[in-house]
């Protein structure tokens, strides 16, 4: 009985895997045989990569050459507070093993890669590209060990260079440009999910309104069959 159970489970997984593979092939063919869509997709990915990587590492280089670790950028709203973040975004997992941090930080990158591979929506491509390259920037940043030119006591060993902070929020997390791009990307993805949900809802609603119940159709047919023609009044000819 146990052997039969595992055999059925194996066959089910095999069948479902084949189904997913066939579905994936159809989606890939649909995306990558459309030359116009492919050009737009590649352009979006390259533009997002250029913006995220250039902004992130130019800013990082400027921070490494800073002469002070704290100053107001926008008084009362945004300050520069330089720190080395050994965790993931916004200081999460700060005291964890570096291997665990690298693993957790790589998850959205791997997921983002597969979403980009199968996505056929431009807004989703923008959002996922920002998340992908934002996460990639942080991993690259963490793997580079640099020394601050003028500052001391801040380590870059297995740490991401963080610098932005909101002073009006108590115990506000310190973040950087890659984190910002990840958040913006997630907002784009959320917007696309809402748009898709609304479109599907309207489509389903319109379909229900246009689809007449079978019972009503049968009743209409029966009425048409039993409907009698109007009785013509006999013409009476009066004799003179």
Swiss-Prot record:
Q: Does the keyword Cytoplasm apply?
A: no
Q: Which UniProt keywords apply?
A: Aspartyl protease, Cell membrane, Hydrolase, Membrane, Protease, Transmembrane, Transmembrane helix
Catalytic site positions? 162, 179
Spans traversing the lipid bilayer: 38-58, 73-93, 98-118, 120-140, 177-197
Cellular component per GO, a single term: plasma membrane
Q: Provide the top EC class.
A: hydrolase
Membrane topology term: Multi-pass membrane protein
A Pfam family assignment: Peptidase_A8
UniProt entry tagged with the keyword Transmembrane = yes
Its annotated pathway reads: Protein modification; lipoprotein biosynthesis (signal peptide cleavage)
> What EC number is given for this enzyme?
3.4.23.36
The reaction(s) this protein catalyses: Release of signal peptides from bacterial membrane prolipoproteins. Hydrolyzes -Xaa-Yaa-Zaa-|-(S,diacylglyceryl)Cys-, in which Xaa is hydrophobic (preferably Leu), and Yaa (Ala or Ser) and Zaa (Gly or Ala) have small, neutral side chains
Q: Where in or outside the cell is it found?
A: Cell membrane
A molecular function GO annotation: aspartic-type endopeptidase activity
Which GO biological process entries does UniProt record here? Answer: proteolysis
Q: Spell out the HAMAP family in the cross-references.
A: LspA (MF_00161)
Q: What does this protein do?
A: This protein specifically catalyzes the removal of signal peptides from prolipoproteins.
- Which NCBIfam families does its entry note? PRK14780.1 (NF011361)
Family matches, as PANTHER family: LIPOPROTEIN SIGNAL PEPTIDASE
Stated family: Belongs to the peptidase A8 family.
What name appears for this protein in its UniProt entry?
A: Lipoprotein signal peptidase
Say which species the protein is native to. Malacoplasma penetrans (strain HF-2) (Mycoplasma penetrans)
């Amino acid at each position: 009985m146990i052997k039969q159970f595992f055999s059925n489970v194996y066959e089910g997984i095999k069948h479902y895997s084949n189904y997913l593979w066939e579905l994936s092939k159809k989606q890939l063919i649909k995306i990558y045989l459309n030359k116009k869509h492919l050009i737009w997709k590649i352009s979006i990915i390259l533009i997002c990569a250029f913006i995220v990587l250039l902004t992130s590492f130019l800013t990082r280089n400027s921070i490494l050459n800073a002469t002070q670790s704290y100053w107001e950028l926008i008084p009362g709203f945004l300050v520069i507070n330089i720190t080395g973040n050994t965790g993931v975004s916004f200081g999460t997992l700060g005291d964890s093993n570096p291997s665990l941090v690298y693993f957790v930080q790589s998850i959205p990158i791997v997921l983002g890669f597969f979403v980009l591979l199968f996505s056929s929506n431009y807004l989703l491509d923008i959002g996922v590209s920002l998340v992908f390259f934002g996460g990639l920037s942080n991993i690259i940043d963490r793997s580079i060990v640099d020394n601050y030119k003028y500052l001391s006591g801040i380590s870059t060993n297995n740490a991401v260079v963080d610098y932005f902070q909101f002073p009006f929020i108590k115990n506000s997390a310190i973040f950087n440009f890659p984190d910002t791009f990840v958040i913006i990307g997630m907002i784009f993805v959320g917007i696309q999910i809402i748009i898709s949900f609304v479109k599907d809802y309207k489509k389903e609603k319109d379909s229900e309104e246009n689809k007449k119940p079978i019972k009503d159709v049968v009743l209409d047919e029966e009425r048409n069959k039993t409907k009698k023609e109007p009785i013509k009044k006999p013409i009476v000819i009066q004799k003179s």
